[in-house]
Amino acid sequence: MRTFIGAEFNRDIKDRIAGIQHIVRENSEKGRFKYVGNFHLTLKFLGEIQQDKTVDIGKSLKGIAEKHQKIRLNIDKIGYFDGRDSIHALWLGFSGELDKLGRLYNEIEEEMYRLGLKKEIKKYTPHITIAQDLRLKIPFEALREKVDFRDFRTVEIKEISLIKSEEVGGKRIYTPVSTFELK
């Protein structure tokens, strides 16, 4: 089963993100746009794991969640990871309690490594992917100027989840396997 650890957002936040995604779509020649219901903050991509491994992962996440307080973040920037001929991933980024988020991320990394999962080598850049393989009609800086984050209120990360990713009817669907409340 293909999985990751993440934090989900409520419908209001997802709808606001979709509003920004709409601006991006209007100013793009091509791209793959994320389904609104799938907007999330990835804390750790696990990849393919065996069903029985979810029990140990769940126990670890429960212990981690009990030690970490809720995290307040602001969605207030747009950026991208570059691809060869296009933007590989267009994302929304955060400010706010990034130090607390970093501590949560590091503990998840260490605990998953202890369970035999691969450690991430790249620096963690917390973000929400809204599009992939994107080719814009306008320069990125012009797109950035069109995006307004004033309607976003502070997002509170209250829980973390082990999330299953599967393809259903040609569309990727994310389903929480287990969810743990932060203290």
Segments from the language model and where they lie:
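Histidine-dependent nucleotide/RNA phosphoesterase domain, centered on the 2H-phosphoesterase fold
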Residues: 1-183
